[in-house]
Amino acid sequence: MSTRASALAEKRLHGLSVQTVGRRVWFAKVTIGLAAMLTLAGCAGRATNFLIPTGQQFAGTSRIDILAATTRQSENTQPGELYSGERAIGLHFADIAVSIPPASARKAGDVQWPASGGGNPLTEFTTIAAEKVGKEQALDRFYARLRKTPHRNVLVFVHGYNTRFEEAVYRFAQVAHDAKAPAVPLLFTWPSRGRLLAYTYDRESANYSRDSLEAVLQFLVKDKSVNEVTILAHSMGNWVTMEALRQMSIRDKGIHGKIKNVMLAAPDIDVDVFRRQVASIGDKRPPFYLFVSQDDKALAFSTRVWGNTARVGSVDPEQEPYRTMFAKERIKVFDLTKEKSGDSLNHGKFANSPEVVQIIGGQIASGQTLTDSRAGLGDKLGLVVTGAAGVVGRAASIAVSAPVAIIDGRTREGLSDQFNELGGQVKQTVGGVVAPLQQ
């Protein structure tokens, strides 16, 4: 081999070596962030497969019926598990009746999670009924509930990353119950594996599901029985929502007026991408309400994963260029940064104020916007609208109770299981990082 050829070969090998080192450094940074989040979140276990029907409702408990449209794969291997985190072809449907403990036995705004396989209906959330249904059966039940709803409104909930099917159901049941919203609860649940280290899989599952969410929204706005639709999305669920709305707007030259409000809680979306999404949706759209917190540690981790690009849910709305962007796009922003949270990651602040859940949920679902003077929200919550961007500060907590956060005391998996998501090459690095953090 010539001297020149040897030099070129050495250069290529050096380049590959640098790339390999770079990947290892990236994995190490990500792993350190994950280990830190695991430490912050504590060591509590995580209940699973608790959608086992009791077949009865106990005195003093409340019943919430949840219709679910899902792109998850059907699961029949374990009792209490209707759908897995794998991807299905097309939309599937389920109907679940959730029992919520008496007010004297629970703190509103929280989910009283049962033990795996069941629970005590007097102190924990339990399942009265749970079954997979076909499209026609789902429609029959949807219309029956819509007829019983005074304003024929629908509340669509899109959960975030690291959320199992049963967790999404219980969290949405809590939202619907505590908000006391006169609307039919409709859950759109996409194939999240419910694992901390399945972040990239979940993101691709979100992309996989945007057409299906659009199909659900198209059905709602075109059906004459439906009066109004409110959308509530959290974390990565905002990505699915914004993509579906973007597609709808491009297809129909705007968003149908039946979609009254869109609430975006802690969006895990790149700021620049969000700006383009909003621009693509255009002016013919419903009001957007954005809930942010600059001390959101989960979104700080996401920022690092995505190359230090700011996430919409953690920006300072009073700073440029965000202030001007929100003003231009007429987006109302609720800044929750100064609010205390029982969530060590500050990613689930929305579950801390049940009173606000009730006020916001009730007013929006009944057809009034958050800035409607008839709603009296300013007096009730101490809201003050400041600046052209419509950034909202508050004295009381704002809450639109989110689904299971990126991770909390109940959402930890065994490390040996989760680290398989990143591959064996990072296990050694993780072991070296987690051990000292847990001491």
Regions found by a protein language model. Give the residues of each.
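C-terminal motif of bacterial Sec signal peptides marking the signal peptidase cleavage site
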Residues: 39-42
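Lipolytic serine-hydrolase domain surface
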Residues: 44, 48-129, 140-149, 169-173, ...
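Short substrate-entry loop that stabilizes the transition state in hydrolases
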Residues: 164-168
